[in-house]
Amino acid sequence: MNQGGTADITVLESLTFKTVFFIIRGNYMYYPSLEMLEEMDLSQYDLVPIKKEIYSDMITPIELMRKLKQYSKHVYMLESHEDKNKWGRYTFIGFDPKSEITCYNKMMKVDDKIFKVTHPKEYIRKVLNEHRSLKLEGFPTFTGGLVGYFSFDYFKYSEPSIIKNQKDNGFNDVDLMLFDKVICFDHFKQKLILIVNIGTNDLQKNYKKGIKELDELDYIIRKHVKTLVQPLKLLEDFKPVLSKEEYCQMVEKGIDYIKEGDIFQVVLSNRLYAKATGSLFDSYRVLRTTNPSPYMFYFASDNIEVAGASPETLIKLEETKLTTFPIAGTRKRGKDDQEDQQLIDDLLKDEKEVAEHNMLVDLGRNDLGRISKFNSVHVVSYMDILKFSKVIHIASVVSSEIKEEYDALDAVDALLPAGTLSGAPKIRACQIINQLEQNKRGIYGGAIGYLDFTGNMDLCIGIRLAYKRNNEISICSGAGIVYDSVPENEYQECLNKAGAVVEAIKMADGGIDYDSTH
């Protein structure tokens, strides 16, 4: 290593079957080395990731996101909380995407180009097929891909019978950003993993360029930047689109459809809204700590800002394994552990709630079955209890093996929207939702997360979130309506589910210096 700290190639370890090469510059490690990549068969891939690791003990994800928002309007942050006292291993952050892909009523917009499509998945699949990446050991679960959302109304592309009777609020059916660079906090190792994807067509040239891009990311992270995120200011209190009376009337109509035999269950939602200025980022900062959840997300693009903490996986694809996590059955949290247990016992004995849960587990099995190998669909866990800051839920896990002819986008078609956000039978329930609800749902009840360059996918259901468009914040929530539902109780359930998000926004609006150690 020379005194200037320029790159040397060093063999660190000789193994029985292979030699592992690293590039070391100064105190930092780049992996894999160019020599290692040249020994691989990359003929099936367009991209390969390379990484640089630095210590992360001097910066937090929140601080870094504040900094990156000064560089780009297009950002995302994905995190998880695995149980009561344990954060997920990784936080993924991105900014300044390579491309932005949206679709609205069959009109696809890719950066500055606009064209018509029959189904947006065909173009999205083309993009992913042009960015096929090798999955390497020693890298985190996400190394680059598409990040964003599929709306609830995306369902219309795979089910033409879904006719829109609601007001069109201009929500994109798809809003995805293409990131070939990823910043990953590894909370276990207390390191930042900087990742760029380089082309496999000219390895020497692209590797040199990739090292430069990693160093540029490192510089941005270390550079002192005055972080000015405009604080959130509510201009009015939240009010519902549907009053209690109007929502209860809608529930009664839903019950009529059930009594007539059209459906067994339908999920009917309401939306709270308020005028506001500033950013939702501080609301996310509060929400991630007051309501930690398996899926926590913040992202912003040209026309929307979203902050949420969802408890529920829509669909996860890891190599060939598909998993979905139906959640149905709800109680408000108690004042203490004893009251919590009483509420849990009551929930598990409630025939209405258990019947609703069983119905939606069956629907999840059926949805997976459409794209899965014969006899591979299994209920992995059944009727577990999940506790969150404001509510208690019943949850199950269903998994299967995807058929060889299908991919992640076919899985989105099969699973979206989730039965827990629509009802059963799904198609008829969605038709009834479109008749009874006043507005398109947009991101609420849709799918949020990533589709990566290796073919994997992790999407949660768009619930327990707030979004901001045109200086208006919206929070949507719904309740599952069955034969013996009590309309007033379902209205209250919607308020309970929205409670954690409303509270986080009001805390951020109050200017509370809510300290976060992560």
Where does each model-flagged region fall?
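Extended alpha-helical targeting/anchoring segments
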Residues: 20, 25-518
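Intrinsically disordered, low-complexity segments enriched in serine/proline and basic residues
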Residues: 4-6, 11-12, 19-20
